[in-house]
Swiss-Prot record:
<keyword id="KW-1003">Cell membrane</keyword>
<dbReference type="InterPro" id="IPR005828">
    <property type="entry name" value="MFS_sugar_transport-like"/>
</dbReference>
<comment type="function">
    <text>Proton-coupled high-affinity transporter for external inorganic phosphate. Acts as a transceptor, a membrane protein that in addition to its transporter activity also possesses receptor-like signaling activity; mediates activation of the protein kinase A (PKA) pathway targets during growth induction, triggered by phosphate addition to cells growth-arrested due to previous phosphate starvation. Is not an essential protein, since constitutive, low affinity phosphate transporters exist in yeast. Can function as a low affinity metal transporter that transports manganese, zinc, cobalt and copper.</text>
</comment>
<feature type="topological domain" description="Extracellular">
    <location>
        <begin position="544"/>
        <end position="587"/>
    </location>
</feature>
<feature type="topological domain" description="Cytoplasmic">
    <location>
        <begin position="155"/>
        <end position="156"/>
    </location>
</feature>
<feature type="cross-link" description="Glycyl lysine isopeptide (Lys-Gly) (interchain with G-Cter in ubiquitin)">
    <location>
        <position position="6"/>
    </location>
</feature>
<feature type="region of interest" description="Disordered">
    <location>
        <begin position="568"/>
        <end position="587"/>
    </location>
</feature>
<feature type="transmembrane region" description="Helical; Name=8">
    <location>
        <begin position="396"/>
        <end position="416"/>
    </location>
</feature>
<dbReference type="GO" id="GO:0005783">
    <property type="term" value="C:endoplasmic reticulum"/>
</dbReference>
<feature type="topological domain" description="Extracellular">
    <location>
        <begin position="1"/>
        <end position="67"/>
    </location>
</feature>
<feature type="modified residue" description="Phosphoserine">
    <location>
        <position position="577"/>
    </location>
</feature>
<dbReference type="InterPro" id="IPR036259">
    <property type="entry name" value="MFS_trans_sf"/>
</dbReference>
<keyword id="KW-0832">Ubl conjugation</keyword>
<dbReference type="GO" id="GO:0005384">
    <property type="term" value="F:manganese ion transmembrane transporter activity"/>
</dbReference>
<feature type="topological domain" description="Extracellular">
    <location>
        <begin position="417"/>
        <end position="419"/>
    </location>
</feature>
<keyword id="KW-0472">Membrane</keyword>
<feature type="modified residue" description="Phosphoserine">
    <location>
        <position position="321"/>
    </location>
</feature>
Amino acid sequence: MSSVNKDTIHVAERSLHKEHLTEGGNMAFHNHLNDFAHIEDPLERRRLALESIDDEGFGWQQVKTISIAGVGFLTDSYDIFAINLGITMMSYVYWHGSMPGPSQTLLKVSTSVGTVIGQFGFGTLADIVGRKRIYGMELIIMIVCTILQTTVAHSPAINFVAVLTFYRIVMGIGIGGDYPLSSIITSEFATTKWRGAIMGAVFANQAWGQISGGIIALILVAAYKGELEYANSGAECDARCQKACDQMWRILIGLGTVLGLACLYFRLTIPESPRYQLDVNAKLELAAAAQEQDGEKKIHDTSDEDMAINGLERASTAVESLDNHPPKASFKDFCRHFGQWKYGKILLGTAGSWFTLDVAFYGLSLNSAVILQTIGYAGSKNVYKKLYDTAVGNLILICAGSLPGYWVSVFTVDIIGRKPIQLAGFIILTALFCVIGFAYHKLGDHGLLALYVICQFFQNFGPNTTTFIVPGECFPTRYRSTAHGISAASGKVGAIIAQTALGTLIDHNCARDGKPTNCWLPHVMEIFALFMLLGIFTTLLIPETKRKTLEEINELYHDEIDPATLNFRNKNNDIESSSPSQLQHEA
């Protein structure tokens, strides 16, 4: 072969290598596709890239991924804690210690409303334009809206609650977008053996967010102690006290942006998710390879016979794989696919389980005032003592129930499995809510405290963690984000129902019948028990995804065979079927 032809081949090889490179990659998200960009066969390149992800061990790379992906959940839970305490602080500034009930509900529910929009909107968008192009956008929305909240002030022309509610709805859109994106990106980058633990650890950042909020609140209350402790009631909170409270809630909410800003670079520079790049964008590459068949004559005319043979083999492989590739994502195909019961029941199971859980998960907070009173961290009218007790009391409850539950899930979800943990959690919670509801007045304060902590534990070592993990694994790549968004949005709808409709039931006819406040709380707990019972049945619809690759899950539960796996099997079958005489003849 002449030196000119050799140079031409080397240039062509470098060009092909460059053609297969993808953008992005940083310390938290390694670009596995670029490790195999030199492989010309798209199916072989796909197989090797996915194998390198699935077989990877657990190390610092995964710890960094957990940190970067988990910051959104940390910010979300931090904000929930901050706004609950912030509302108390605001009430001293604008309402002499007693914010109207509708205003409180509006500020608390507004974030959930935005979250529903973000979960569905960003979830769908990530399947249309890709994960890389929008990952980080939701964090930018959260950061900007959090900063804007700290600048809101009251004036005759501007309603304080209305403006703050608007910013919280928009911030909720960012928070909602983080649910499907962080879940599916973590899932698609995670090693098969520890995928559940990695996804669970991302979600467990919620506990750290609540703890961070409590610690920062304690520091702020201690720092402003001199401006608060002399006010023994909201009426006694004068201009000095009001200024301190006004500064505290703004600092408390504003500090929620710090970790988000620190992690923003890593989100904006991630590579495209390998599964999305290979599953959704692969058809274009395979179609281009198939066009080589049209140039078969031109290939034979070249002086390099080996290049011609290789070109024909690649074209043949591409044509074969096109027939086995999943259909292109579209609304019509989505309806066709999930309109079939064997596929649609999985979406019903994930969405239904998340809905039933969140009704009770957010409704359980209705008992918080009673629980804090029991452990001696409620009841004081002194401004300093009330803020201090609220922060410390909630920290105790989080560390007693929520935090252990999250991490027991993380350490066992890849051993026990997702479905058994979720099923057992719903069964135990059904029993616990029945006890709380039907024996409420016989339990006593300490009995109620014990059951409250146990409920918190089994919600997190149970469906609260698994309802986040399973939707990120059990759907085809082209609809994984959309389906996760639908499931998560269903949960938030349940939360809104709990905070509005069921939340108001606790005082149903109490004043009319001359009964104390919260007289209907036991019956509300019984309603929550019914939702937990429904969760048992929705859990039966979901598959077990433990220790299976995403491609194996797709083949098992959606009947879509990975083209690279099929190609690899066919090659092995061809080798095994070849007789020794044939192999000797070929040699």
